[in-house]
Amino acid sequence: MPLRRLLRASVPTARLEAVAEEVVHRYGGSSATFEKMEADNWLSVPLVVDDRWFVKVIADQHTLLHGVLTAGRNLGARSSGREGFFEHFSTPVEMADHELDATRAMRELGVDAPEPLAAFDHDGLGVVVLEYLPSFRTLDELSAEEISALAPTLFGHLSRMHGADLAHGDLRAENVLVAPDGDGEVGEVGDPGETGDPDEETLYFIDAARVQAIEDARAYDLACALASLSPHVGADAAVDAALERYPASSLSPAAEFLDFVSLRPDHDFETAAVREAIERAA
């Protein structure tokens, strides 16, 4: 989209080079070479530095846009008769710190996520440094059969977070990664700290907003999960996967957020089909 390209181009290359050099200086890499990643990301410029680190560079314009999107999301939540639960951050480094904390919180719960290394300010830019998963695929790059097999794990991750009174807050296909177990350090859900079999694949969450998981935020997460899965596996199969981790009574509140979620440009699903599948399950 033109606006996204403008935002990505708005951080001069020289400033990105300086960030890459700082990352290598801090972590002892062999080269400050970097590559911009093509990602559906409005709120940072994502880089891969030295083929070792995933770095998100956040500028003032990203913070401003985050404020606009946050206001819109909270307005949308209120239009669904719910309290707004998205938090705005006033500076790039606040956004960076929040993402680092959210990623740490997920891993502490046994939810697979790239290892968080640091968040810092560099010349007014917010910088987040995470481990890089070189062989990852996003959820929408998988086959329907692969998505169907991984759907219970996705809801298992959400259930762990919700059980600890946390929510993801921005669950969509590009924020769900699948990579060989050998790429990361967490392994399967429930076995943090163990490296898995490289012939197997693990589902990772990224970019969690880590909103406080009041009931409405949990319902919103579930609505986003169903919106992400149903185009690939069908509404009934997506709901069935959710029911492996959640009671049917938890899905009814999610149905109230489907119209709101459908307005997001990063979700494209049949709202009526998902709502009907939830009603059948109930």
PLM regions and their residue ranges:
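Conserved kinase catalytic-core helix
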Residues: 96-97, 102-113, 136-174
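Catalytic activation segment of kinase domains across protein kinase-like and atypical kinase folds
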Residues: 122, 131-132, 137, 167-224, ...
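A glycine-centered beta->alpha junction motif in the catalytic cores
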Residues: 60, 77-85, 127-144, 210-211
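ATP-binding glycine-rich loop module of kinase domains
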Residues: 42-95
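C-lobe/activation-segment region of protein kinase-like
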Residues: 200, 204-281
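Short beta-strand micro-motifs within the conserved protein kinase catalytic domain, predominantly
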Residues: 115-125
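Juxta-kinase regulatory segment immediately upstream of eukaryotic protein kinase catalytic domains
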Residues: 1-42, 259-275
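Terminal disorder- and signal-encoded targeting elements
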Residues: 1-10, 149-150, 157, 183-198, ...
